[in-house]
Amino acid sequence: MNTIKILIGLLGIFLFSLSGIVSAQSDATTQLSQLLSNFRTYQAKFNQITFDGQDRVIQQSHGRVMIMRPGRFRWETDSPTKQIIITNGKTLWVYDVDLSQATQQPLAQKTNINPASLLSGSVKDLKQKFTITISPTPDAATFQLVPHLGKSLNFNWIRLKFSKKQLTEMTVLNNLDERSIFQFSQIKVNAPLSSTLFEFKPSRGIDVVKQ
């Protein structure tokens, strides 16, 4: 599965503020909104493993992720190839280090849905975009999000696992029945991050492709 497609499809969940939520309900949507609104920045290392429909491993990778809300995201893959995905909320850069090539394009054009509008910040909007259920345990909570817009988001469902109010695992099933599991470790929430981490200025010699 193409990791870029997964990440772009999910950007709206993490990048855009969910502040200002007021609800007397204690349903899955409200609980997820409250958890996501707890952080301004998020840093972690990740390990990814992807299985095909027959549960065969087809991809593994590891690296780090950095998020600053609203709108900024940096995903660095160290292995099997070095790749950096950066957005400041407006422009998306995908830099393939080994190829010395960077792709630049407006973020909204990467998917049929503008990530900025995916979650606009209210329980009502979450319910309009997704069917959300929760599977709680004594020390964790796992939310499943099924998009109402189906294939236009490149995935069938997402599962977000929170332990001690921190996002520790994300599982995605795509339209090809491929399942990717992202496990996060060394998590830092609301630690200072420089805004320069979310800007990309190609060095001389890097081939830039605009889309």
UniProtKB/Swiss-Prot annotation:
It comes from the Bacteria. Keywords: Chaperone, Periplasm, Protein transport, Signal, Transport. Its main location: periplasm. GO terms for cellular component: outer membrane-bounded periplasmic space. It holds the Pfam family LolA. One of its GO terms (biological process) is lipoprotein localization to outer membrane. Participates in the translocation of lipoproteins from the inner membrane to the outer membrane. Only forms a complex with a lipoprotein if the residue after the N-terminal Cys is not an aspartate (The Asp acts as a targeting signal to indicate that the lipoprotein should stay in the inner membrane). Monomer. Belongs to the LolA family. This is Outer-membrane lipoprotein carrier protein. It comes from Coxiella burnetii (strain Dugway 5J108-111).
